[in-house]
Amino acid sequence: MDTAENLLLDRGYNGFSYRDISNALSIRNASIHYHFSRKTDLGVAIIRRAKERFAKWSESMAGKNIGYLKKLNEFFLIFKKYVEREQQVCLGGALETDFKTLPGEMQEETRIFVSIMLQWLEKLLADGRSKGEFKFVGTAKDQALLIIASLQGAIQIVRVTAPSCFASTVKQIRSCICA
């Protein structure tokens, strides 16, 4: 599943096949079909695994006695790792790009995954603003959407420019919301 996820992040869902996975792992296609009879099943499994990872991560953040800005910085690191890993895009960005061509099951899982991340960030921003750590115009929901869209866009732009574009984006986000 790791190989399939990496291919998805590099090429998009429509940019790889079971043959690409089997070639990378030096196995036969039948071995993959044994575990995932359809590519859709593999895609759904990748998204569900990502949701589980984010749930564990967000639980760990809830348990940390650190400020809201530090939690936001930890959130930025989730996206930064894609820039550092051979300039991959994040899972949300990869799936959103292919969304109209994804099977229905994957579309639904993608909606849920993106919604979970947006809700977590919205709550962080609302709580941080109520405690005076963040200051921004508009609702926390709108700000969360702006931040995630900016991070995903920065990851895309890095592919054709330089990794410093991601750092510049994060710097600008911080300057726009820090009290």
Regions of interest found by a model, annotated:
Residues M1, I47, K51, Q107-L118:
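Amphipathic, non-transmembrane alpha-helical scaffold segments
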Residues T3, L7-D41, A45:
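Helix-turn-helix
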Residues T3-D10, W57-S60, S150-I157:
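Solvent-exposed, amphipathic alpha-helical segments
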Residues A45, R49, E59-V89, A140-I147:
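Hydrophobic alpha-helical connector segments
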Residues K70, E74-Y82, S115-Q119, K123-D127, ...:
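C-terminal peripheral helix-coil segments that are non-catalytic and often amphipathic
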Residues E84-E105:
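Amphipathic alpha-helical segments used for helix-helix packing
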Residues E108-F113, S130-L146:
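All-alpha amphipathic helical-bundle segments outside canonical DNA-binding/catalytic cores
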